[in-house]
Design a protein with these regions (language model features):
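Mg2+-dependent phosphoryl-transfer enzymes with acidic/Ser/Thr/Gly-rich catalytic loops
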Residues: 1-4, 22, 184-256
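Asp-based phosphoryl-transfer active-site loop
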Residues: 3-18, 222
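Active-site phosphate-binding/coordination module
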Residues: 23-122
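Residue-level signal for inorganic ion chemistry
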Residues: 32, 67, 151, 195, ...
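Short active-site oxyanion
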Residues: 36-40, 59-61, 149-151, 207-209, ...
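Hydrophobic packing residues within well-ordered alpha-helices of enzyme cores
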Residues: 50-54, 162, 166, 221, ...
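Short hydrophobic/aromatic-enriched beta-strand-loop microsegments
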Residues: 60-66, 84, 128, 176, ...
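Conserved acidic, metal-coordinating active-site core of Asp-based
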Residues: 101-212, 216-218, 233
Length: 256
């Protein structure tokens, strides 16, 4: 029996230029909750950004945020079920390295605030208005006033051009992953870590979970659950790894 649904956002629940969850999906989330099935977004996004995206049902959801680095239970706001902070000294060293790279901007995440350094006004506008993050500006990484759970490099020249440099220097200390055309994330957690936290808090077994994803950073969570689904437009390698494919998440939710 399925007791938990986890779902990636960008490329899975939202496609192309979509910026809002459609009414059909929100209706299915409500219906499943009435049946005792919890819906849990699993994303690299911040908690505030995810709550804004799911505003009509946000209090009823758990959230795997920042690629598994912090997990919130249902509520307004929900309790922190778990988080995986970075070593502060290493995180600040990483931030300083990012600052030396041409065209790279630091975006370091706390529990529900991100901290930008060496950025311009357009970057701030994008993070606050388009992404929906609570974003503060700091003059120096040392000024970040809380535990750092994720460091991101915004690479104006593209993540693919910078990933080799950062992997060579930092893969021994962090999980280093491309998180978008211009983003590279550094964490100690992944979405599978987040799922473990949710399952422990709920008393749910992985085989009682159905998960949806579309990219390589979804592999840890898809590999753990009883019913993994990959989007039909995902990379061929991923479609071969996970035989259950779907075009739209709502189509599968209706069958539960």
């Amino acid at each position: 029996m399925i007791r938990l649904v986890t779902c990636d956002i960008d490329g899975t629940l939202l496609h192309g230029t979509e910026t809002a969850i459609d009414a059909e999906t929100l209706g299915e989330i409500r219906r499943l909750r009435e049946k005792g099935v919890l819906f849990c977004p699993a994303s690299g996004r911040q908690y505030h950004s995810l709550r804004r995206l799911f505003r009509p049902v946000a209090d009823e959801l758990a959230f795997i945020c920042e690629n598994g680095s912090v997990v919130f239970g249902p509520g307004s706001p929900g309790p922190v079920w778990g988080k995986v902070p970075l070593d502060r000294t290493e995180a600040i060293r990483l931030c300083r390295d990012i600052m030396t790279q041409p065209g790279c901007v630091i975006n370091a995440s706390g529990e529900n605030t991100c901290y930008a350094c060496n950025c311009d006004e357009e970057f701030l506008r994008h993070m606050r208005e388009d992404v929906g993050n609570i974003t503060e500006v700091v003059d120096d990484p040392e000024d970040i006033p809380e535990e750092i759970i994720k460091v991101s490099a915004f690479c104006r020249g593209g993540a693919d051009a910078a990933i080799g440099y950062f992997k060579e220097r930092w893969e021994a200390a962090f999980q280093v992953a491309v998180a978008g055309e211009q983003w590279i994330d550094f964490t100690l957690a992944d979405k599978g870590t987040g799922l473990e936290i949710v399952c422990r808090a709920m008393g749910v077994r992985p085989e009682e979970v159905i998960s949806f994803g579309d990219n390589y950073n979804d592999i840890p969570i898809l590999s753990m659950v009883g019913r993994p689904y990959i989007m039909e437009n995902a990379a061929e390698e991923l479609r071969e790894m996970f035989p259950n494919h779907c075009r739209r998440v709502a189509e599968v939710l209706k069958t539960l």
